[in-house]
Amino acid sequence: MPTPADDLVVIGKIVSVYGIRGEVKVYSFTDPLDNLLDYRRWTLRRDGEIRQAELVRGRLHGKVLAAKLKGLDDREEARTFTGYEICIPRSELPSLEEGEYYWHQLEGLKVIDQGRQLLGVIDHLLETGANDVMVVKPCAGSLDDRERLLPYTGQCVLSIDLAAGEMRVDWDADF
């Protein structure tokens, strides 16, 4: 039975074909990149269309993956898979240690400073090398209409309450 769309998490995207035997080139959102290959059954999603695929094999190729999907043996047929997001059910993600979070858990949280001012909501996160950065966008009731970039560090993030949908931060609202 297929997983409901709202229970899926995106772990990569098919960006083009690879070679002439029906393989696809995949951009992985996992860390490390080849963790995506641990998941054999993929739900592919593009423009509201959903289809199932089974990974036969894959390998790391520079900063992308080359993947062979079951039943996909032709370059032109593989080209029709370009643009699909690769999704898996959230329940298949490994459990994390206390105080660790997946990015999808942080997206949508309200960000509140020490003065109890609502700065906005986390729209998405960026990987910068030194530390991850949260992109906080204004929302109804937020302090102003500014987009903010906050470091996802222990110094900035004071607490996270997933049940309440809130993150408390040590951040000057003027930045």
Curated annotation (Swiss-Prot):
Keywords: Chaperone, Cytoplasm, Ribosome biogenesis, rRNA processing
Keyword Cell membrane tagged: no
GO molecular function (one): ribosome binding
Coiled coil ranges: none
Record note on quaternary structure: Binds ribosomal protein uS19.
Task of the protein: An accessory protein needed during the final step in the assembly of 30S ribosomal subunit, possibly for assembly of the head region. Essential for efficient processing of 16S rRNA. May be needed both before and after RbfA during the maturation of 16S rRNA. It has affinity for free ribosomal 30S subunits but not for 70S ribosomes.
UniProt record similarity statement: Belongs to the RimM family.
Protein name per Swiss-Prot or TrEMBL: Ribosome maturation factor RimM
Originating organism: Pseudomonas aeruginosa (strain ATCC 15692 / DSM 22644 / CIP 104116 / JCM 14847 / LMG 12228 / 1C / PRS 101 / PAO1)
